[in-house]
Amino acid sequence: MSIRLAAFGGVYSNHLALDAVLEDIGQRAPEHTWCLGDLGGFGPSPEKSAALLRARGLPMLQGNYDHSIGHGLDDCGCGYTDPSDNAFAQVSFDYTNANVGEATREWLRALPPQARLVLNGRRVLLCHGSPRQVNEFLWDSRCSDAFLEWLCVAHECDVLLVTHTGLHWHRALPTGKHVVNVGAIGRPAHDGRMNVWYAELTFDAGRVAVGFRPVEYDHEALAREMEAERLPAEFVETIRTGWWTTCLENVPVRERMRQWGEARG
């Protein structure tokens, strides 16, 4: 009997995309649904996203944003190294921090950093950045098969699910293990499209199938909300165009070029 798992990450306060994703998942009715963390950042009114997730009782991991907000830290702990990336990240963090109530902080503080499942005999590890570090970026172009295999063996899993980079990808390893970056639903995937993506995995007795589902939502309504909240115009432009305008210095060249090629193709 097949078992399906839906997973998404990087909500980034995009409550309209979250609502659309949850509706799509609800129609498909997988046996398991997980959010891999990062409630806030980038978008408007983070409490709206918190209310949606808590009302559904959806299991969620603690991302770097959730840890920082929950524990009253001064920045998002995103792991950026470029000053421009960090400057925009700080604007986003300060807004989120100022618009989250104590009940939500307590909830975020209590979230687990990782989770383990066994689905049709496959050991599944869910985390935010990587099993090693909550804010580690696992980029497709920078992760060799050997490294990903080591990561799975070292952390005792057959299927590894992560997020944090904002770009979705899947690697089927020669040994039969799988690594899946589920991407983010809080902003588009830097491909000139305004939809967002989540991952759906199907576990059969002898195989694992991995797919990504695009979800449309009212991105223009979100852009107007962001403008009303006086969030940076650069953030709003990303929602309206499907192209990232901030935190790009952290993205490897191959990811930038591949996304450009997909949009042009």
Briefly describe each language-model feature range.
Residues F8-G9, T33-D38, P59-N64, C127, ...:
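Active-site neighborhood of phospho(di)ester-bond hydrolases with catalytic His/Asp-centered motifs
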Residues Y12-A17, G41-P44, Y65-G70, V159-L173, ...:
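Active-site environment of divalent metal-dependent phosphoester hydrolases
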Residues I25-P30, L119-N120, V153-E156, E200, ...:
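Glycine-rich phosphate-binding loop signature in dinucleotide/nucleotide-binding domains
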Residues A172-G265:
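Acidic, His/Gly-rich catalytic cores of divalent-metal-dependent hydrolytic chemistry
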Residues M1-A6, L117-L125, P174-H178, A205-A209:
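Beta-strand-turn-beta hairpins that frame and shape the catalytic cleft
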